[in-house]
């Protein structure tokens, strides 16, 4: 059985130690994150497993607040001829370590009990004497220390790296706990591994994380594909002369709910448990707070609604009618309420039976696909410590609405594929299952 690696996370107050752990653990509830010093007052332990095997124990430590005071004590009460670790041990046995420098003592004890430490640096900060003092006393613990830069975006690290090099700290990593980068995390673990006599545990962790990342991506795209097929197969029939407006509104409501359920599954998959999709979510991008039937969203994603007199029919509606004679009059009748009806298809069976069939239009299916891929991108690039609002970059629809993937076109003629038709979710899921895998491969973020 492999002995787990123990890793202390240390640094000045409010540099992002707990945030780093939240992101590495994929746990947005670990510890407490505030924009205030000394939020963490005690050492907290967390564990990364690979199945039943424990790989790495991570220790969140209190912030170092008065390393200069500790260094002064060491220089006054210990001999420069003693090894650094002996001087630290003398400090930890002192009265001051249990009173005046209680927080610093907790950090140093944990470092000495660990295999190595990560020293978290706020890259926005200038190089100050207090940080030099912290690195000095940490180095006396005689454990490998790797600096980790947080908040690195648009920051010049030259002054920092020069200072670190003068202290013989040549291996470091940049890892933004807010704007998550999976490959950046892998580099962090890889850099840590280079500082150990044996790297087998961290190599195993790296391989596990790569497998997990690929699994999450595959499962997420399958969830999206399954939702799109469910929505595409959703149909309702009404009599030829019935007002479709009430039915259309019900259909829109059911698709909204179906989308929300799928989005929540993506949140759970990526372990953002306490965040909800919708207007109550403070950090969600504007696009996700908008109704999927909002015409502005079509413009946002560059989705064209067609040409000619019927182009405006889809705007704000999101559902077509495969209808029969008299459809033009019908469109005029409800145009003021729902933006019009697009008589885009003629179904001979409906015509004979005097029926209208309502179903989700290609533009709305394309919009839904674009929205869900955007959400996936957000979840894959957001650290679990992030608390701020996200601004989406300009993103495009995954396909031309006039050229839906064959799987969605097939769904539109197989009403049993939709749980909204059958009210039997598992049965409908089984009906469309064979097409989920192929559609998911066409969903490119």
Name the predicted role of every residue range.
Residues 29, 67-70, 129, 157, ...:
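Active-site-proximal flexible loops/turns
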Residues 37-74, 186-200, 248-268:
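Internal hydrophobic scaffold segments of catalytic domains
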Residues 78-172:
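Conserved C-terminal guanine-recognition region of P-loop GTPase G domains, centered on the G4
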Residues 1-17, 116, 140, 193-445:
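Non-catalytic alpha-helical scaffolds
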Residues 63-65, 124-126, 152-155, 178-181, ...:
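Conserved nucleotide-binding/hydrolysis micro-motifs of P-loop NTPases
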Residues 38, 143, 150-152, 177-178, ...:
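An acidic- and aromatic-residue-enriched active-site/binding cleft used to recognize and process polar
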Residues 1-91:
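Conserved G1/Walker A P-loop phosphate-binding module
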Residues 151-216:
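Canonical P-loop GTPase G-domain recognition
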């Amino acid at each position: 059985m492999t002995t787990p690696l123990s890793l202390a996370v240390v640094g000045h107050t409010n540099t992002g130690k707990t945030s780093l752990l939240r992101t590495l653990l994929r746990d947005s509830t670990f510890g407490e994150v505030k924009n205030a010093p000394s939020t963490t007052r005690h050492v907290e332990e967390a564990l990364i497993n690979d199945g039943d095997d424990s790989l790495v124990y991570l220790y969140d430590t209190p912030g170092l607040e008065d390393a200069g005071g500790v260094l002064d004590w060491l220089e006054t009460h210990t001999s420069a001829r003693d090894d650094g670790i002996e001087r630290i041990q003398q400090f930890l046995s002192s009265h001051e370590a249990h009173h005046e420098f209680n927080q610093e003592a907790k950090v140093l004890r944990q470092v000495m009990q660990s295999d190595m430490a990560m020293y978290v640096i706020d890259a926005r900060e200038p190089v100050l004497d207090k940080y030099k003092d912290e690195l000095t006393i940490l180095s006396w613990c005689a454990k490998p220390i790797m600096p980790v830069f947080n908040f690195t975006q648009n920051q010049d690290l030259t002054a920092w790296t020069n200072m670190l090099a003068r202290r013989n700290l040549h291996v470091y990593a940049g890892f933004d706990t807010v704007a998550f980068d999976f490959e950046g995390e892998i580099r962090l673990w890889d850099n840590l591994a280079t500082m150990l006599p044996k790297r087998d545990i961290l190599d195993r962790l790296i391989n596990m994380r790569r497998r997990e990342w690929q699994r999450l991506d595959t499962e997420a795209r399958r969830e999206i594909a399954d939702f799109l097929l469910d929505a595409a197969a959703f149909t309702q029939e009404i009599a030829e002369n019935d007002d479709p407006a009430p039915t259309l509104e019900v259909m829109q409501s059911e698709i909204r709910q179906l989308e929300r359920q799928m989005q929540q599954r993506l949140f759970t998959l990526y372990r953002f448990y306490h965040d909800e999709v919708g207007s109550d979510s403070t950090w969600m991008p504007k696009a996700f707070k908008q109704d999927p039937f909002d015409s502005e969203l079509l413009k946002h994603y560059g989705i064209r609604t067609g040409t000619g007199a019927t182009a405006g029919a889809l705007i704000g509606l999101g559902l077509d009618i495969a209808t029969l004679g008299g459809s033009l009059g019908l469109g005029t009748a409800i145009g003021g309420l729902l933006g019009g009806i697009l008589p885009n298809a003629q179904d001979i069976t409906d015509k004979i039976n005097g029926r209208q069939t309502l179903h989700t239009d290609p533009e709305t299916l394309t919009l839904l696909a674009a929205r869900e891929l955007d959400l996936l991108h957000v979840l894959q690039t957001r650290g679990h410590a992030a608390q701020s609002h996200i601004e989406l970059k300009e993103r495009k629809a995954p396909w031309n609405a006039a050229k839906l993937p064959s799987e969605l076109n097939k769904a539109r003629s197989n009403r049993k594929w939709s749980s909204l038709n059958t009210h039997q979710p598992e049965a409908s899921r089984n009906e469309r299952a064979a097409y989920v895998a192929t559609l998911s491969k066409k969903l490119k973020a």
